[in-house]
Amino acid sequence: MEVTSCLTLKDLISTKKNKSDPVADGRSAQKENMFDRFKISPRLPLRSEPIDLSKQKSFTPERIPVTPVKVAERPQADPWTPTANLKMLISAASPEIRDREKKKELFRPIENNGIEETDTDLQLMDSVDDIDDLEKRPSRKQKSLGLLCQKFLARYPSYPISTEKMTISLDEAASSLGVERRRIYDIVNVLESLHLVSRVAKNQYCWHGQHNLNETLRNLQHIGEKQNYRAQIACFNLRDMGMEYKCDEQEKGCHIDHLNTPLIELSEADCPSVSSSSRKDKSLRIMSQKFVMLFLVSTTKIITLEIAAKILIEESQDAADHSKFKTKVRRLYDIANVLTSLGLIKKVHVTDERGRKPAFKWIGPVDFTAEDQKMEVTTTIPSPDSKKDACNLSPASDRVKQRLFRHSSFNIVQSFSAVKRKVCSHPCSPQKPQGVESSDSYASKMAHLATICKPKAEEDSKNGNIENSSLPFSVVVPMPVDSDYRVKPVVHQVPLVSHKTVCEPLGIMPPSQSNEDCTNHGFVPNQPYMYLPSNSVFMLCGNLSEGKATDHLAMSLYPVPGSDSPTLEETTMSKQERPTKRQLNDKDDAPLSLVLPKKSRVDNTQSLQKPICKTTTPEQLQHVSREEEYNTEPVTKHSNVGETTEEVGSRILPHENVHLHPAVPPQFLYVPTTQGLNSFNFLLPANHSAGLSQSQLASLNVPYVMVPSSALTAFPFICSPAVSSGASGSTLNGRMNFSQAGTSSPTRLIIGAPQMAVPQPPEPAVDQTKNLSPLSVSPVSAKCASSKADSHDSLSQSIHTAKLHKSPTPSTPKSIRPLHKDAFFKTPGSLDVSSSRKPQRTQTRTSSSAQRKLDIDSSAGN
């Protein structure tokens, strides 16, 4: 068996013979002969693919494959750097990008080659700055025009001082707000349409504020009414609802008016361009004015942007394509944002058939006249030069200028009169200087009184109680003259009772006159109220005839519940303030009191035209009459004709509060119901007839008038006796009969001087109170028994008191002294002194006066 050697690596590498070993050469020759084909074939695989040497030892030369062995695929490893993928993408990019990068590298300085390591750091820093810029960039809401307008308006005051001129630089405002200048232009154009700013130069505006805003809005409303925008709004609203509306002719007329009517307050240089240039008509300023007009003339004050855009597109005669409509809506939305920032409109939502869509509602001023007056009152009085400048700068018409100018002058006059009243009424000295009293103080007081009493007079006139209402309210202001004041009769007559129960006429007795208080006042026709400087009460007492005493029961003008006149109890409750008013009555600058207080307006016309009666049964009336007749004292007769009554104070004397309150002096008026007295009527002045017809009321005998001594000096009483039939016609002008003329005994009077301690009587039963009249319910009749013992003292002191008061017959004085002759300061104790110091009057009549000695007659009770 032949042994062959294995093929080694040495054999593959070198094919040369080794001459040093002949044996080997023989063997190699033999091998070459044997393996001739294999000598060439192993070289071919070396070129194509390497041989796996690890397997060569197990293979024989015969077993070596001719084709190469396929190597198993392995997964590729991750890239070495994070930017390997980026580099691969850059390499795959277009050649233009690579050429651009090459050009940048060519133009870079040579030094950059040394600092290539810092390029990556700079790129990282740039990326961080970009992130910060994105965070600092404002949001869409922050860039809105409404918020930008609020920031712009916050830089300037709404009502700047007229002396300061504020200039707006658009470049400065844009840089400070961090926006482009075109955004500031949008705001300024809308503000210029409302005259809040005015253009001075390029990018320079003057700030005026909202001083003239109401006037501008009023003018815009006037122009909008001329353009008939209200009909156009209604037309488009009905069109949206699918209804037909005939407004084509109105729209044509509106377009003609619009072409002929220039908008307000355009400068002289702008007026020709406005009428000729369509570009000027489409400007944001003109569009803003028209948009505001739509709000001012609208009835609902709500406008949608669609309707506004349609009206403005038709007005500008543009092609109504969709692109123009969207442009108009965007421009109107910018205007609405600025107006919202000004507080003139607000955004609302309107629901219609198509759904919910946004709209804007007007919340700005509507009544411009009232706000103008309010603003003028709060401002200071300008100088004449500034008034002229304001009138020249005013954008209103000539008619409005004249009205505003008159109003400013009225403010000046009003302030002067206010200062004059303040100086005249200032209590700088205890006695006012001699001279005529200023009527401004009277006018101010009476104006305040008019506001209180006028609603009541109007209510009465509506109910038909006042027949002649030509003068709803009038007063009598006392002015010093050279003669006595006379009582003028009222034209219309008011019946108090029926004609069957009336036998004698009655008139009004004016208060007695003195040198210090000469204050008889005349009545004006249709005069509901009368103002008197002194507290005076007119008393009308009516009486039925003696023969009809049993047929006709007591009648009273004290109203029933529901009437406006007070009852006797209400009148008594309102008298506790009388001492204060009596003291103020003698002061020259005291507020002049009315005849009627707030609670005691017995002069209500309703209570006069309708006789309001509270009747009593004959048994109750006779019981009261017997009790009073038992305590009746004889009185002295009077024979004076045409005498007048003295002042009785401003209210009816109370009859219940006797010695209950020490601070308030006891005061009461006591009239017993004798056999001839069946009615007691009180009439407080002064809006009714002063002279009644002779067949209206019966006269009255007043046997008792009881007054305490503390109030005697301030409240004297003088009653007149019977008036003859011949003289009654001449005394009807302002005087009253208290007794029946020629048929009955003359009037009897007792004035009680001392204070009478009267115990409080028990109150009547409830069932009797309901049936009795106010005079019968009052506990006056119960006081008679306790007052009998003091009646003689009352009579003796009444004679002394009656001598203090001279003849009540008025005589014309030489000169009427003003009302401010009294001392400026008075104490409550000086009332008696002032009344006792009244000078005596000369007696002009020959008839016996009331100051004669009173005869005490026990049989004079009738």
Curated annotation (Swiss-Prot):
GO terms for biological process: chorionic trophoblast cell differentiation; DNA damage response, signal transduction by p53 class mediator; hepatocyte differentiation; negative regulation of cytokinesis; negative regulation of G1/S transition of mitotic cell cycle; negative regulation of transcription by RNA polymerase II; positive regulation of DNA endoreduplication; sprouting angiogenesis. Residues 575-590 have a biased composition (Basic and acidic residues). Residues 140-209, 279-364 bind DNA. Residues 564-574, 633-643, 832-851 have a biased composition (Polar residues). It comes from the Eukaryota. It is found in: Nucleus. One of its GO terms (cellular component) is transcription regulator complex. Keywords: Activator, Cell cycle, DNA-binding, Nucleus, Repressor, Transcription, Transcription regulation. Residues 561-592, 617-643, 788-862 are annotated as: Disordered. Signal peptide: none annotated. SMART domains: E2F_TDP. GO terms for molecular function: DNA-binding transcription factor activity; DNA-binding transcription repressor activity; RNA polymerase II cis-regulatory region sequence-specific DNA binding. In contrast to classical members of the E2F transcription factor, atypical members contain 2 DNA-binding domains and regulate transcription in a DP-independent manner. Both DNA-binding domains are required for DNA-binding and are proposed to form an intramolecular structure that is similar to the winged helix structure of the E2F-DP heterodimer. Belongs to the E2F/DP family. Homodimer and heterodimer: mainly forms homodimers and, to a lesser extent, heterodimers with e2f8. Atypical E2F transcription factor that participates in various processes such as angiogenesis and polyploidization of specialized cells. Mainly acts as a transcription repressor that binds DNA independently of DP proteins and specifically recognizes the E2 recognition site 5'-TTTC[CG]CGC-3'. Directly represses transcription of classical E2F transcription factors such as e2f1. Acts as a regulator of S-phase by recognizing and binding the E2-related site 5'-TTCCCGCC-3' and mediating repression of G1/S-regulated genes. This is Transcription factor E2F7. It comes from Xenopus tropicalis (Western clawed frog). The gene is e2f7.
